[in-house]
Amino acid sequence: MSALLVEIDKDQFQAEVLEAEGYVLVDYFSDGCVPCKALMPDVEELAAKYEGKVAFRKFNTSSARRLAISQKILGLPTITLYKGGQKVEEVTKDDATRENIDAMIAKHVG
């Protein structure tokens, strides 16, 4: 299932997220973030649910702090939905639940 939630690095971010057509959801996490790891299976399930409608990517901020700051990622986990390279909505920290992520996607994608 995790093949739908693809990990990208800072060198791929521009092409995979900022230059992508359509919707891209990015799961920002770090090596030491326990809530991030707990949330990952839920994000993988949502990737399957929205397959073909939203591209799901995960991004480890541990090795790319500058990029995380440039995207205004101030707390983890942060789940951000982009459309055509523009940030449209995000949920972060305690609000980053499966239900809230699903509702955010459904609101924009349908």
Curated annotation (Swiss-Prot):
UniProt domain Thioredoxin: residue ranges: 2-110
Classification via InterPro entries: Thioredoxin, Thioredoxin-like_sf, Thioredoxin_CS, Thioredoxin_domain
CC annotations in GO: cytoplasm
Disulfide bridge positions per record: C33-C36
Membrane-spanning residues: none
Keyword set includes S-adenosyl-L-methionine: no
Keywords: Disulfide bond, Electron transport, Redox-active center, Transport
Pfam families (UniProt xref): Thioredoxin
MF GO annotations: protein-disulfide reductase activity
Function: Participates in various redox reactions through the reversible oxidation of its active center dithiol to a disulfide and catalyzes dithiol-disulfide exchange reactions.
Recorded family membership: Belongs to the thioredoxin family.
Designated name of the protein: Thioredoxin
